[in-house]
Regions:
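Long, contiguous bundles of hydrophobic transmembrane helices that form the permeation core
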Residues: 51-113
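Transmembrane helical segments that form the transport core of multi-pass membrane transport proteins
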Residues: 92-189
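Transmembrane helix-loop junctions in multipass membrane proteins, especially transporters and channels
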Residues: 39-40, 66-74, 137-142, 263-271
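Structured catalytic/translocation cores of nucleotide/phosphate-coupled proteins
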Residues: 17-18, 25-29, 73-83, 139-141, ...
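C-terminal transmembrane helix pair
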Residues: 1-60, 189-271
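Juxtamembrane non-transmembrane "cap" segments at the membrane-aqueous interface
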Residues: 21, 78-90, 149-153, 182, ...
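Short juxtamembrane and helix-loop transition motifs at transmembrane-helix boundaries
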Residues: 7-16, 88-89, 144-145, 170-177, ...
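Short, charge-rich amphipathic segments
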Residues: 74-97, 122-127, 156-157, 193-196, ...
Length: 271
């Protein structure tokens, strides 16, 4: 967002390319955190497979977004983001600032942007993550509610069992509870990562699940919470539905690629 506000940076793009930066940036927004977390759980090459899947999902999402933008606004294919090049020329004529001032400005501007985005995504994070946790996990082992964490009504696993063959075919999920990760990642990938240790302790997770979790966690990165705020800050709020649709498809593609890549690698290892 900070780069997008820079007129000189924006001048390198046509409008349809500039708008798709939202999808491109979201696909890798939490990449380092997701990969480090998975490595910390004892998995090493599986997150790399997930990274490859996220890269493929990013390509799908970004190109789809560009297609939708050009289809609905054909003139965006030829229009520059900065129509008046004189503005850039005037910026270049400004007096050069000292290194200290530039560092200070970058810290202040970056901090303000971070706080703005954080405040914008809090409602989505709280609402989506809370709902998913309530709908994923059941009561305690005694069947009673004790007020402990991860106690809910376990509706999602019951529904997932009905269509588990779809998730098993596309993602290789061996347990219906695992569908909670991608659903939570819609709102906040950090909250989705918090589910993984519990999944591991329950014995539901294997290497394939880690690869798929990494891919879909990186690619989606809580985009339902952030896309609206990002496009609003860029001035294209009306394109939010297109961005969300494109990124939904991109995340699914990332998970499928990660699953297939993992299966191919396992075939070579077995051979």
């Amino acid at each position: 967002i900070s780069l997008a506000s820079d007129k000189r940076f924006s001048s390198y793009f046509k409008k349809f390319q500039f708008i798709s930066l939202t999808n491109f940036g979201t696909a890798f927004g939490m990449g380092l955190l997701v990969m480090v977390f998975m490595v910390g759980q004892g998995y090493f090459w599986q997150p790399v497979v997930g990274f490859f899947g996220a890269f493929c999902g990013c390509v799908v999402s970004t190109r789809l977004m560009q297609y939708f933008v050009v289809k609905n606004f054909p003139h965006y294919a030829v229009e520059d983001v900065i129509g008046n090049k004189q503005e850039i020329a005037e910026e270049e004529k400004k007096v050069e600032k000292s290194g200290f001032i530039r560092v200070l400005n970058s810290l202040l501007d970056g901090g303000r942007t971070g706080v703005d985005v954080g405040l914008a995504i809090i409602p989505g994070v709280l609402i989506i993550s809370t709902l998913v946790m309530i709908l994923t996990f059941g009561p305690s082992s005694t069947g009673a509610y004790t007020g402990a964490a991860y106690e809910g009504v376990a509706l999602l696993p019951r529904l997932a069992e009905k269509v588990n063959f779809i998730f098993e075919f596309l993602f290789g999920f061996g347990d219906p509870h695992l569908i909670a990760f991608p659903i939570t990642a819609l709102g906040a990938v950090g909250a989705a990562l918090g589910l993984v240790p519990n999944f591991i302790s329950q014995g539901w997770v294997d290497g394939n699940a880690i690869a798929v979790f990494t891919a879909i966690g990186m690619c989606w990165s809580g985009y339902l919470s952030t896309h609206t705020a990002m496009l609003d800050s860029l001035g294209y709020r009306e394109l939010t539905p297109k961005a969300i649709l494109s990124h939904t498809i991109g995340g699914i593609a990332a998970a499928i690629v990660a699953h297939l890549t993992y299966m191919v690698i396992m075939l070579f290892i077995a051979a």
